[in-house]
Regions:
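Carbohydrate-recognition beta-sandwich/jelly-roll modules
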Residues: 40-278, 283-295, 476, 480-490
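Aromatic- and carboxylate-enriched substrate-binding clefts and catalytic-loop regions
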Residues: 302-453, 457, 468, 476
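C-terminal beta-strand-rich structural cap/linker in extracellular carbohydrate-active enzymes
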Residues: 566-598
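A short glycine-rich, aromatic-capped structural motif
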Residues: 689-766, 784-787, 856
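Edge beta-strands of extracellular beta-sandwich domains
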Residues: 590-599, 666-678
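Functional-site microenvironments in short loops/helix caps that host divalent-cation chemistry
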Residues: 703, 756, 761-903, 910-915, ...
Length: 934
């Protein structure tokens, strides 16, 4: 039968997971206005829809030497094949007639130097930039990363562009009806000019040409970036071959976030003084700190190559123990979830360039290597991957640089090079191909790594610990490793989100210089937060759609986040650390947060030290002692049904944070955070059910089961009591002793069993020669420990009553204050006589169920033991014959009303035995035998 609900749900899922930034229409024409220079005033879409631009925009703007110029301010001449604009006596700009393209509108422009001096052309920006547009252009000193992204309402931030797109210009702006335009400019070539990263030098008569590509999109400004970078690959490539990305044997790199590269002469790899390898120690440290190292590369070549005639392959084979030892290391590494990399140095001409593919394949085979670090390469090639594949599957190519979009089909991993000292905040390579595995090079010997680790985490990719340069392994390095361990842990647990093909950079925030990226995986959303404000940040940060079926957690701090609703809008807060202002602009700056939006899957609850875990099906449940980490303490459960566990049994006497995580394999699905704090007590006892009675013994009475409500209070609350007010409980029917256990009855137990406690201190202190005083056979037995009482109860086939059972037996369901009614009568009980009385001395003081001697003679032990993180105590009820009157600090004695409860602090069996505490027992029943009985 057709199920419309399932179809609709499937449509919604596809709507959210399939990237969709472009519109059904495309941009067909951009119309020019020539009244003031060359400007754009309207658009025509592929379906002939005409759209006017609210405010005319120049066709482009650019920087001539140090001055920004606009096509809207130039002298214009019409040509048969386009337009020529002249900027003083310096430059001619030729704008060719636009051409149609299936992927939007494009236009070629050419700058020509008409002066007698060399000029510099840079920052060619399609449609210019204003306060309402989003743009990318070069800014600041000439260095490897000087591209800046400008957004309305925020200060610019730096971005990383592909290595062949440093000169790229980008802009986007709203048009009308929810439609926006986005455009890029790409340098196509020069005639007589000199190309530099971000600019072109034009001697006299030299030329440089650019191509402008434009398209339309709907929605947030980020969709324009997605269209140009992710969907159209900056027009570097028309179709993307995903063959390598779809290979299951290479999928491991997409779950990898930590690579270590080390030279063969490093003492952490081989200790020359001891003459032995220390590689196993390195792996062990990696496990302790990071769970594991994803990949480890050993480098025995540069800068040793050239000292003698040996080539790069010889240096591998001449390592101590030879290639056989390296192969052993490969196996050892894989046993510890680490892949072993070798390196390839194509510049090593001594290695016979013609045999390079053959030699590298042979070394992969001999070393059983899992990957190859491609020195001085930004890309790989099919021949190289094929050479590796001919040996074994799963061998990865890892380039020194980052592949440009056209080369990405041939390699699936690369690096943010340490040529860039301070990494830009946003890496747009991650937007181009979200499943391309990126690793930021952190040169340990160069400087501290903190800032670079933070930015890698913000961008959802990994880190390469590069140990080539000596030095840097000091106390700051250990701090960096701890920081890296924390980011790596979150990246791994949320790998599914960080592969989101439709992730969104830089969602709107209430504060500047604190940035948020959004990542989704199924019903989970991850927000990575990067703070570059030295004072730190704590407060409302970004808007969400309020949803009562979701909850929010900081995965960085492992704290619950309560959304803030104001003016009909809902906001999430963030908390990031600050730093000394003097550290800004250095690698000491930067702090992060990571906020998760989860569906309500776990639903775990903490009551006392009892943790309720819901059924998790095939998923894993991890219960953490404190914050989750690679070195943290946790217990794993696979639960087919709801389960209650004791935290004391898991973690001993621990107070603090408890984090519960639900994982599907390695990926986090939900997280609950609880705080297990001492002070407020929780019950640690359980009821050990007896054999169910089918009849009523002469010395017992039936208490019918019921649900009832009662109120309790305590005289002193310095040590907190359990919850006392408005207690509603359901009690099953049971039998209770009519009287407290007497000396005679306890003596019978001793004669029958020969029971003797391990600790005999104060045991039956009032007895002489192992028998009670003459004439006191019917007095309540005292000077017993909890263990003594339970031993008797087991012998009798009974147990101690819970406090609720004692309450019901004493009070009934009418809430009376005393067993006999609401008024106190001194003749109904032992009224603080200062000595014990027989248990049947006050039969008129019975309860509604005819239970006798409930108050005034001895405090009566219940089964309820509590723990507050520091102390154990039992609940006793009813008061006793002893009532100290000389000071208000004493426990109040004498008969106690039924709304008063009292704790008895526990130390040891001997210490706990006293003259005022006795007990009575109860027995479970088979209810079917007692229907209608009272």
């Amino acid at each position: 039968m057709f199920n419309f609900k399932i179809l609709f749900r499937t449509f919604l899922v596809l709507l959210f997971i399939i990237p969709c930034t472009a519109l059904p229409q495309s941009l067909s024409k951009v119309h020019f206005s020539t009244l003031y220079g060359l400007r754009t005033d309207s658009l025509t879409l592929s379906d002939n829809t005409a759209l006017s631009i609210k405010r005319e925009k120049p066709v482009l703007s650019f920087r001539l030497d140090e001055k920004m110029l606009s096509a809207g301010d130039a002298e214009l001449r019409d040509m048969a094949d386009g337009y020529v604009l002249q900027f003083g006596n310096s430059v001619h700009l030729k704008v060719n007639q636009p051409s149609d393209d299936s992927q939007g509108w494009q236009c070629d422009v050419e700058f020509e130097n008409i002066s007698a001096d060399t000029v510099t052309i840079s920052n060619v920006l399609p449609f210019g930039a204003d306060s309402a547009s989003v743009s990318i252009s070069g800014m600041g000193p000439d260095n490897p990363a000087r591209a800046w992204l400008s957004r309305p309402g925020y200060s610019p931030l730096r971005v990383i562009l592909p290595d062949n797109s440093w000169e790229l210009g980008y802009s986007s702006f709203d048009v009308q009806n929810g439609i926006s335009v986005c455009a890029i400019s790409r340098r196509m070539g020069t005639v007589g000019g000199i190309e530099r990263r971000y600019e072109t030098l034009l001697p006299p008569k030299a030329k440089v040409s650019y191509r402008i590509y434009a398209g339309i999109f709907r929605g947030d400004w980020q969709n324009g970036l997605k269209l140009m970078f992710r969907d159209r690959y900056l027009y570097d490539i028309s179709e993307f071959d995903n063959t390598l990305y779809q290979r299951s044997d290479l999928a491991w790199i997409r779950e990898s976030y930590l690579i270590v590269l080390q030279m063969a002469w490093d003492r952490e790899f081989f200790d020359r003084q001891a003459g032995k390898y220390t590689f196993s120690d390195l792996l062990r440290k990696g496990i302790d700190q990071f769970g594991h190292i994803d990949a480890y590369g050993i480098w025995p070549t540069w800068p040793r190559l050239g000292l003698d005639q040996r080539n790069q392959w010889d240096l591998y084979r001449d390592l101590p123990g030879g290639i056989r030892q390296l192969r052993i290391f490969g196996g050892l590494a894989r046993q510890n979830n680490t892949r072993l990399f070798i390196s390839g140095n194509p510049w090593d001409v001594s290695a016979k360039p013609d045999d390079y593919m053959k030699e590298i394949a042979e070394l992969i085979a001999e070393a059983d290597a899992d990957g190859v670090f491609l020195d001085i390469r930004n890309s790989s090639c099919r021949q190289l991957q094929s050479a590796a594949d001919s040996v074994r599957s799963g061998v990865l190519m890892y380039s020194e640089g980052m592949a440009v979009p056209a080369d990405m089909p041939g390699i699936i991993s690369g690096r943010v090079h340490n040529d860039i000292f301070l990494s830009p905040e946003l890496n747009l390579n991650k937007l181009i191909k979200p499943d391309f595995s990126i690793f930021r090079v952190c040169d340990v010997g160069e400087d501290i790594l903190h800032r670079e680790i933070a930015i890698s985490f913000f961008n959802g990719y990994g880190t390469e610990l590069n140990l080539f340069r000596p030095g840097g392994r000091d106390e700051n390095y250990q701090k960096d490793l701890d920081y890296l361990a924390a980011t790596t842990f979150i990246l791994r647990q949320n790998n599914d989100a960080f592969l989101d093909m439709d992730w969104t950079p830089l969602i709107g925030t209430l504060a500047d210089r604190i940035y948020v990226n959004r990542w989704r995986a199924g019903e989970k959303t991850i927000f990575t937060v990067l703070n570059l404000r030295p004072e730190g940040f704590d407060g409302k940060l970004f808007r969400i759609e309020g949803n009562i079926a979701r909850h929010y957690v900081s995965l960085w701090n492992h704290e619950n986040i309560i959304p803030v609703t104001e003016g009909g809008m809902t906001w999430l807060t963030a908390n990031t650390e600050g730093w000394l202002a003097s550290a800004s602009g250095t690698r000491k700056e930067g702090s992060v947060d990571c906020i998760a939006e989860f569906p309500l899957l776990l639903g775990s609850k903490l009551k006392g030290d009892s943790l309720l875990l819901r059924s998790a099906g095939d998923n894993r449940v991890l219960v953490w002692k404190g914050n989750p980490s690679n070195s943290g303490v946790f217990k794993e459960f696979r639960l087919g049904r709801d389960t209650i566990i004791s935290l004391k049994q898991l973690f001993g006497y621990y107070q603090g944070k408890i984090v519960v995580q639900l994982l599907n394999g390695k990926n986090l699905l939900d997280e609950n955070i609880h705080y297990f704090r001492g002070g407020k007590p929780w019950m640690v006892s359980s009821v050990e059910r007896t054999v169910r009675a089918t009849g009523i013994a002469p010395d017992m009475l039936l208490i019918p089961g019921t649900e009832f409500t009662y109120e309790l209070s305590a005289e002193e609350d310095f040590i907190p009591y359990p919850e006392l007010s408005g207690l509603t409980t359901s009690v099953d029917s049971f039998l209770i002793d009519k009287y407290p256990v007497t000396n005679a009855r306890y003596y019978e137990f001793l004669q029958s069993t020969g029971y003797r406690p391990v600790d005999t201190t104060r045991y039956l202190k009032h007895w002489k020669y192992d028998i009670y005083p003459q004439g006191q056979e019917n007095y309540p037995v005292v000077y017993l420990s909890l263990e003594d009482m339970k031993a008797y109860a087991r012998w009798a086939g009974k147990r101690l009553p819970t406090e609720a059972e004692w309450q019901l037996a004493a009070q009934g369901t009418d809430g009376r204050k005393w067993p006999w009614g609401n008024e106190f009568h001194g003749t109904m009980c032992n009224n603080a006589f200062g000595k014990l009385t027989p248990v049947n001395a006050f039969s008129k003081g019975m309860s509604p169920y005819e239970v006798v001697d409930l108050v005034g003679n001895v405090w009566q032990m219940t089964n309820d033991m509590y723990f507050n993180g520091s102390y154990y105590f039992m609940i006793i009820r009813g008061g006793s014959f002893y009532n100290p009157e000389s000071g208000r600090m004493y426990i109040k004695g004498g008969p106690q009303p039924l709304d008063k409860t009292q704790m008895m602090l526990m130390v040891s069996q001997g210490y706990d035995r006293n003259a005022t505490v006795g007990f009575r027992c109860v027995k479970d029943i088979e209810s079917s035998y007692f229907r209608g009985k009272r």
